[in-house]
């Protein structure tokens, strides 16, 4: 337990004794008053040490460049919970001259070391990647959902598990799953079409307004269920089914109270609060347990099917299912419990990120009709029409502009625009000694828009053309492996990158091929007011109030 944690325990005990004496004995011993005064003075001294003395004189990083001014309460932020962490990091990186490392402070003068160049990034993400991990609070919070999924394994265990899971995520294997992605994307389109027909939008005949993110999350959840686990969750057809409702319980929006806990968690261990029997904890546990039971059931079924196939027809594996679970089971390297943890990790990380990218794609295309027409012509020429049926293969090489749009969305709108890691042992970053416990930060929001890492103008603008130039189709003009950190980099990079890069074009292509899309913001003709699109405060790059679009169904495809 930390020093301030012990202080909190002693203060609680003293105050409890104070109240007991006051209520039952109607007197307050001087010893209790002395204790309270001493504890108050200790807190003042502790606070002064960490907010003034340590940052100025004692931090081992005092020689690193840092912003010229700092608030004791808010650090280098413009306020408490009023500015997203990635905006703070980018502002600091742009205003403080540096050689790859910057010392800056968040609320309560909590120190961060911001990594800004490729040399330092390579140390954190590749060369010494296993020296860094998530904070204790983040580990505890996420492990309630995923258990010991791939993101929490370290060292050789991580290498072994990743190596044996990788066959399910190779580009070749994911390509075999794209017909499932396409079928589900078309299922989403049909659902939207039905909503448009039943909608209340009367501004233009044959149109309707839909909110993108709800449809996107249901589509990507069903995709990962069907293609990933061989189990259709059915939320596109029935968003109110038990699976959909239980799954939602796992993703409660962080409250202001949680933000405070995370902030103070740098000094006090609040993990016990996540075990209290309050409604949020009960709902999260219930949702997680429900999904884990489904995962166990599917794993048992896939294991039985695999055994039957291996013991029949002389072990002929032709026509074996291609979902993630079956592929992982075929390696014979995982226990059922380990595989359940990995399934939960894929569920948590594997659908929301693509759904959010799709939402931003609809936002960008929704006010760019010229881009829509260009990609629609391409999609309708080379991708299967809704009436094709029984699609066996989807080839994206023939739709370069669709790929360019998806690549640009992933560059400009990384799902995790900012990340922190904690040094789990003494290590080095760019020749700088980094003691155990140091919090190191890096930001895709910085690297993905860094003019030193990318060629071409207007890196803050949405410009798919950067991916259309000869020789830049796969790089967009980036000159480093650390230029685009949407999927991170190194041995701990996102294992599902190929999945997202195949799934997103299916969703965007099906949507643009089927509808004319118009972004809807502000007051409409019928008096309805729709929100202006903006970023939500939080850890991920999501829209604050959703993205609403007016859809007009297009025929003759």
From Swiss-Prot:
Record-listed heme binding positions: 494
InterPro entries, alphabetized: Cyt_P450, Cyt_P450_CS, Cyt_P450_E_grp-I, Cyt_P450_sf, Cytochrome_P450_monoxygenase
Keyword line: Glycoprotein, Heme, Iron, Membrane, Metal-binding, Monooxygenase, Oxidoreductase, Transmembrane, Transmembrane helix
UniProt-annotated glycosylation sites, renumbered to this chain: 127, 393
Pathway this chain belongs to: Secondary metabolite biosynthesis
Enzyme class: oxidoreductase
Inducing stimuli: Expression is positively regulated by the fusarielin biosynthesis cluster-specific transcription factor FSL7, probably via its binding at the 5'-CGGNNNCCG-3' motif present in the promoter of all the cluster genes.
Cofactors named for this entry: heme
GO CC terms in record: membrane
Traits of the deletion mutant: Abolishes the production of fusarielins F, G and H, but accumulates the intermediate prefusarielin.
Subcellular localization: Membrane
Gene3D superfamilies named among the record's database cross-references: Cytochrome P450 (1.10.630.10)
SUPFAM superfamilies: Cytochrome P450
Gene Ontology MF annotations: heme binding; iron ion binding; monooxygenase activity; oxidoreductase activity, acting on paired donors, with incorporation or reduction of molecular oxygen
EC number per UniProt: 1.-.-.-
Domain of life according to the entry: Eukaryota
TM region(s), chain numbering: 6-26, 32-52
Protein's membrane topology: Multi-pass membrane protein
Family (UniProt): Belongs to the cytochrome P450 family.
Protein task: Cytochrome P450 monooxygenase; part of the gene cluster that mediates the biosynthesis of fusarielins F, G and H, decaketide compounds with 5 methylations and a decaline core that act as mycoestrogens as they stimulate growth of MCF-7 breast cancer cells. The initial compound in the pathway is produced by the reducing polyketide synthase FSL1. FSL1 lacks an active enoyl reductase (ER) domain and biosynthesis of fusarielins relies on the trans-acting enoyl reductase FSL5, before it is released through hydrolysis catalyzed by the thioesterase FSL2.
Protein name in the entry: Cytochrome P450 monooxygenase FSL4
Originating organism: Gibberella zeae (strain ATCC MYA-4620 / CBS 123657 / FGSC 9075 / NRRL 31084 / PH-1)
Organism lineage string: Eukaryota, Fungi, Dikarya, Ascomycota, Pezizomycotina
């Amino acid at each position: 337990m930390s020093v301030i944690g012990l202080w909190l325990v002693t203060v609680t005990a003293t105050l409890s004794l104070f109240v007991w004496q006051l209520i039952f004995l109607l007197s307050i011993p001087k010893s209790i008053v002395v204790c309270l005064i001493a504890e108050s003075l200790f807190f003042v001294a502790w606070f002064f040490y960490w907010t003034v003395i340590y940052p100025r004189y004692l931090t081992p990083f005092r020689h690193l460049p840092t912003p010229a001014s700092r608030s004791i309460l808010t650090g280098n932020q413009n306020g408490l919970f009023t500015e997203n962490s990635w905006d703070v990091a980018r502002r600091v990186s742009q205003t403080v001259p540096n050689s790859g490392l910057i010392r800056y402070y968040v609320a309560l003068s909590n120190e961060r070391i911001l990594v800004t160049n490729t040399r330092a990034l390579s140390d954190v993400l590749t060369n010494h990647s296993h020296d860094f991990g998530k904070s204790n609070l983040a580990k505890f919070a996420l492990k309630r959902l995923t258990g010991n999924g791939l993101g929490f394994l370290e060292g050789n265990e991580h290498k072994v598990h990743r190596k044996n899971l990788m066959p399910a995520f190779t580009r070749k294997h994911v390509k075999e799953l794209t017909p499932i992605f396409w079928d589900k994307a078309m299922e989403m389109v049909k659902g939207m079409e039905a909503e448009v027909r039943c909608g209340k939008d009367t501004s233009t005949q044959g149109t309707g307004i839909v909110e993108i993110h709800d449809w996107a999350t249901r589509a990507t959840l069903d995709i990962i269920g069907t293609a990933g686990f061989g189990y259709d969750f059915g939320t596109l057809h029935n968003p109110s089914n038990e699976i959909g409702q239980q799954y939602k319980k796992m993703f409660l929006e962080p409250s202001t109270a949680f933000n405070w806990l995370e902030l103070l968690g740098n000094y006090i261990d609040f993990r016990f609060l996540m075990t209290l029997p309050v409604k949020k904890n009960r709902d999260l546990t219930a949702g997680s347990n429900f999904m884990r039971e489904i995962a166990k059931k599917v794993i048992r079924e896939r294991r039985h099917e695999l055994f039957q196939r291996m013991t029949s027809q002389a072990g002929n594996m032709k026509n074996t299912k291609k979902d993630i679970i079956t592929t992982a089971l075929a390696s014979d390297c995982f226990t059922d419990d380990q595989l359940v943890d990995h399934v939960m990790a894929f569920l948590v990380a594997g659908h929301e990120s693509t759904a959010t990218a799709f939402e931003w794609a609809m936002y960008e295309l929704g006010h760019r009709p010229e881009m829509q027409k260009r990609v629609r012509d391409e999609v309708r020429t080379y991708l299967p029409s809704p009436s094709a049926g029984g699609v066996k293969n989807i080839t994206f090489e023939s739709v370069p502009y669709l790929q360019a749009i998806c690549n640009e969305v992933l560059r400009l709108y990384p799902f995790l625009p900012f990340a922190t890691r904690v040094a789990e042992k003494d290590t080095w970053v760019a020749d700088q000694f980094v003691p155990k416990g140091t919090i190191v930060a890096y930001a895709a929001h910085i690297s993905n828009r860094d003019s030193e890492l990318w060629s071409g103008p207007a890196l803050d603008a949405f410009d798919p053309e950067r991916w259309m130039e000869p020789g830049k189709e796969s790089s967009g003009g980036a000159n480093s492996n650390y230029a685009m950190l949407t999927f991170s980099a190194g041995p701990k990079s996102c294992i599902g990158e190929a999945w997202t890069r195949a799934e997103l074009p299916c969703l965007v292509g099906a949507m643009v091929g089927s509808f004319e899309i118009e972004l809807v913001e502000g007051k409409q003709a019928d008096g309805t007011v729709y929100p202006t699109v903006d970023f939500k405060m939080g850890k991920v790059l999501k829209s604050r109030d959703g993205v609403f679009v007016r859809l007009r169904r297009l025929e003759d495809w």
